[in-house]
Amino acid sequence: MIKSSEIKKIVNDYSDVKIGVLGSHSALEVMDGAKDENFETTVFCQKGREGPYQRFNRIADQIVVLDKFKDMASAKNQKMLRDSNTIVVPHRSLTVYLGYKTIEEKFKVPIFGNRKLFQAEERTAKKGQYYLLEKARIKYPKLFKDPKRINKPCIVKVQEKKRPLERAFFTVSS
């Protein structure tokens, strides 16, 4: 795990902070909010996926086009992020494309939040997001493991086969 003291040292040298994000579907909202707060933004896109950021040119001050999303973690790009005083705002796609090991051990760029908690966001982790919600006494939707037990209106979330990061939703009542 990258020591927080290493990241603190990097952040202490920052002056005008910029916001960086991996350019998947979640990035548009993150960047729109960053612009609302008057931050400069950088988005890292996989080749062929830069279109939305070019169309909504208000939200991206800099678009970095990569061969693969995982290239965001290259030494060259990490240096560029640090040199430009960038804090990365993470979302699910960052952990999927860069991987936990890379983020925890190699990605020496400040991240908004706690890189130790990313794995806890997994639904399948022993002490994952549902465990944390229960510990915090935060209500969350009931999970039905057997569809035969559904006895009231429910929203069903289905992971798409061809696009593993995407989910389809529909409603049922029984």
Locate the predicted segments by residue.
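Anion (oxyanion) recognition and catalysis
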Residues: 35, 82, 105, 134
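A short, GP-enriched loop/loop-strand-helix hinge that lies immediately N-terminal to
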Residues: 84-124, 139-144
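Short amphipathic alpha-helix with an adjacent loop that forms part of the alpha/beta core around
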Residues: 71-83
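Short internal beta-strands
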Residues: 39-48
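N-terminal phosphate-binding or glycine-rich loops at protein starts, especially the Walker A/P-loop
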Residues: 3-37
